[in-house]
């Protein structure tokens, strides 16, 4: 990679990281990047003129880790930057004995398969555009977060504790954070839109109840990443005016299975967070 330098990512690279998100039309804002850099670590490739051309992050979660933000500026693609940083991340996780996991777009899925990842389950990003009229039920859960129960349920669903992440998200969009005895939902603000997720619940009815409550507190534009194993939830979202934006596939490196219990997950936190 003549004419470029590989280096660890830090807060001094925030402007370049945000430029990568904008170029890819992703929703991360500065708070997202600060969260990911604080809870994980990453690498970048910077050109000799100081431009951050590519990035990759890893977010460790006990026995596994999320590979995230594999981004390259459009004008510097097809130079091997993404593959190189992905392999740097894989080597780092191999040394730490952590199983790599990621959420792939259709464009990245084949690349990741060639690097040893395999499909597990899938979800779709749905968006609600500004100005769309929504009609949500009048009744729903109305409980403050009970952290002990939230963390226990999330650990069962996700497969590891991610308390720092959840507590951070609870401060980002507190009016949309709700808890019942059978589930919880959180959200955050983003560069392009608000985003709801994660939403973890014991069943689909509980998930729809939580989501309807959260939706009454916020206005579009809005993103949700809804799992494909809950077709009734996706149908309900479509009836509220949400439209499909893009699919994702959750992939695990090697022969392992995805951790946790995906049947409890209804909205993921986002492909960058898990």
Roles of regions detected by a PLM:
Residues 14-73, 161-202:
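A conserved beta-strand-loop-helix scaffold within acyl/acetyltransferase catalytic domains
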């Amino acid at each position: 990679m003549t004419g470029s330098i590989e280096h660890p990512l830090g807060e001094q690279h925030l402007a370049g990281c945000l430029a990568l998100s904008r170029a890819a039309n992703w929703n991360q804002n500065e708070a997202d990047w600060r969260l990911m850099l604080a809870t994980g670590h990453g690498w970048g490739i910077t050109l000799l003129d100081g431009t951050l051309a590519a990035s990759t992050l890893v977010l460790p979660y006990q026995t596994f880790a999320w590979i995230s933000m594999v981004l390259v500026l459009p004008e510097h693609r097809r130079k091997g930057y993404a593959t190189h940083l992905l392999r740097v991340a894989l080597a780092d996780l191999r040394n730490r004995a952590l199983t790599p996991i990621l959420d792939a777009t259709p464009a990245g899925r084949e690349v990741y398969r060639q690097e040893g990842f395999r499909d597990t389950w899938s979800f779709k990003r749905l968006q609600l555009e500004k100005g769309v009229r929504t009609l949500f039920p009048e009744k729903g859960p109305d409980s403050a977060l009970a952290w002990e129960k939230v963390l226990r349920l999330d650990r069962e669903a996700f497969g590891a504790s991610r308390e720092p992440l959840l507590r951070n998200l609870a401060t980002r969009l507190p009016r949309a954070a709700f808890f019942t005895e059978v589930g919880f939902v959180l959200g955050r603000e983003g560069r392009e839109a608000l985003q709801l997720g994660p939403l973890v619940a014991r069943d689909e009815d509980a998930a729809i109840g939580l989501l309807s409550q959260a939706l009454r507190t916020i206005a579009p534009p809005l993103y949700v990443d809804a799992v494909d194993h809950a077709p009734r939830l996706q149908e309900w979202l479509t009836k509220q005016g949400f439209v499909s934006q893009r699919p994702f596939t959750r992939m695990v490196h090697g022969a392992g299975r995805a951790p946790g219990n995906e049947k409890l997950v209804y909205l993921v936190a986002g492909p960058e967070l898990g």
